[in-house]
Amino acid sequence: SAVTLDRKMLSGFIEKHCTKCHGPKKQKGETRLDTLSIEITNSDTALQWQEVLDVLNLGEMPPDDEPAPSTEELKNVLAHLTEALTKSKKRLSESGGDTALRRINRREYKYTIDDLFGLRVPDELLPPDDIAEGYDTVGHDQQFSSYHFDDYLKTAKTIVEVALKWVDQPRLEAKHSVNQPEERTNKHLLSYVADYDKKMARIKAGATHTQVGIEDERQLQLFIKRYDSRAGGRKRYLQRTFADQGIYLSDAGSSSHAVGSYQINMDPRATYKFRFAAAIAQETPTIRHFLKCRVGERTIGYFKVDGSFEKTSLHEIEYRAHLSDTRVGFNVTENRGNLSLGTYLQKVGHKAEWSSSIWVDRLETEGPFYPNTPSFFEKHYLQTLGQSEVENEDEQAKRFLLAFTREAFRQKDPAAEFIDRVYKLFQLNRKNKRSIKESLVTPLSMVLSSPSFLYIMEDSPTTGEQFVSDTELAHRISYFLWSRPANGQLLQAAADGKLSDPIMLRKILDEMLKHRNSWSLAEGFFSQWADLKRFDEIAINEAEHISFNNGIRESARLEAQHIFHAMVKENRSLTDLIDSNFTVINDLLAFHYNLEYPDKDSEFAKVSLPANSPRGGMIGTTAFLTMGSNGERSSPIIRGALLMEKFLHREPSPPPPNVPELALASDEPLSVKEIVDLHRKKAQCASCHNSFDPLGFGLENFDLLGQWRDEETLGNVGKKNSKKGKKTKRIPIQAKGVFPNSNRPFKNLREFREGLVDHKHLLTRSISEGLLSYGLGRHIEFADQQAIDEICTNAASNNEQVRDLIFEIIKHPIFRRSDKTE
């Protein structure tokens, strides 16, 4: 039943204090209050009144330039709204939130296929998820059209064809091979030089352009002019010390050996180890000591080279093959941006004799290495249709198709007519003289493009409490934590009733969250909660910031995910997102942050931070700090809005229409704070900016790339239209401000972090709502608030530790409710 508010009390209060900005003529923040229903019958209405209560409690409304309500008047309104919304929360929670039927997303599709076939699907084979905002697991926001169906059908066919091709191939013995990249490179250079020398000799002997094989006389003169730079440069390269034993990377005038590479044949079922031995060729800036390692077009790691000609450094990385990997190139290049070599060398202040910085001695490969157990597909195919002599083929085919379909449909029995249809397709193909493998392609592709595979189907109970079955709960837990269907161990626990036993459930969840598969929780949930998509999309001018190349961008994104993954595995407190004594970095980020790095390979490692380090937590990462910029300079406004939304659990209001751009309003050099103050003087901007701008200044010691600074350079730094000779000056950074919801001041990063930690209950709620939305595949509603209150209260008693929070979510009845809408 509805909860009815006091019309007389609230109408008078709103008319007196609110309608000027939130009434028929103006709706600041897209909010209108005079038409808000006093009958709270649903979550939307309750949520709107909750927002009113929140801003009144925080003292944000009415604004300072409007008449304030008396203490007694405000006290009565707050008490009435609080009591009414508490009743609404309880009544609405009894009906629960509805979960729309949801499709498995790209990440879940890849991991589900991996479980079925033991094959890794490359991203380029899958259609995009097309999620504008929110989590990619939320059914209401997912789109699926005939375009998606056609793409998934094509992808399924590719997967099945590769799986059938390799399913009965013998597993090869692992071998170690060594490639000397200079052999191919030097052979090419010698041939190139010989051809140039031969032509030049004939020209000197009086041969015409036609006799030499050159287009015309003009091209002949151009050939003579370029002879020394082209042939001479290659000759000089071949004469360099150790050029006959390895390859110098990125040498000027010789693009053919800018990379060290060779081709290898791969088994898509296997994992390989790649190694290379390298040395620093000459004294160059440290920024030029990093290599990028790729397999085909995929970058798989970054390495810092610190070896010498006498003692090279050896680097190794593992690579799990994709199903499209059959013959691919393994190559290493110097890690730098997209600038031309000449521009890049000029930017880094290169003064060495040669342009090359790194010498590669050799490239090595070891493998293939196979998983210990066969995939479901391999095991069941070899037991039925994959035998050397198949007895009773029809029976074996039906047995295989039924077992595969049931596994693909997550232990749900397929409809008899569906199995009959795929079985008849197999029979028809066999009658048309196709092999067993050829006959299986279309039937299995149909299974993998069926709604029962692409959508997570949960049956609604017909009687009693509306909870999912134990098997459905097992899959719900597994897709939540691992982005893949439940394995045999979890399904057996469900069958034994262990998921309803809190002690057994906790043991199961701890094991799952310590397993490597829990990486998908960082990859899927945390990257979306932290809004790392914004970091991916922000444009940084590489010519102005040469250190910020793809290597730093990719590494910084992974750092944020690795921090959360470490918190999950070690059951650390959520406050580690604010302040921690560690971070998780690779060698490239260690250089970027000026930190010591103990592990000399590209794999990420958890490192302890020095006592005085500004790093620590999500807010100390390049990913967070860079997406809190406008691409040219740090932005307290953007950082403040991100902090408010993620860490203080309050979504900033959208800007009013026609709001002016935050831009320089003076010809004089201005600090970021002065620019923001100019913006806040505008009446339409002040009320919102007063709430989150002060937060952003707490991180102002970090520049737009997340590097520490004590001073700010004033002027049109990085602007293309900046006037030459324009004066700039440097002033000390002032990282001070105030927390908007408590008026607690801070005057440096340490005090800012302490203040944010004191608001940890808001971060806990932000993460809790995010995890619940991600895990259930639906938006959080007002009806869910009582459950979230209970979850957060229990998590707080355990110091907001991540695994404890996840346990509280999964054991709560809200996580076990059945879907109610389709």
Located regions from the model:
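Low-complexity, glycine/serine/threonine/alanine-rich intrinsically disordered linker
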Residues: 2-31, 44-60, 64-822
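Short, aromatic/basic-rich helix-turn unit that serves as a nucleic-acid recognition element
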Residues: 34
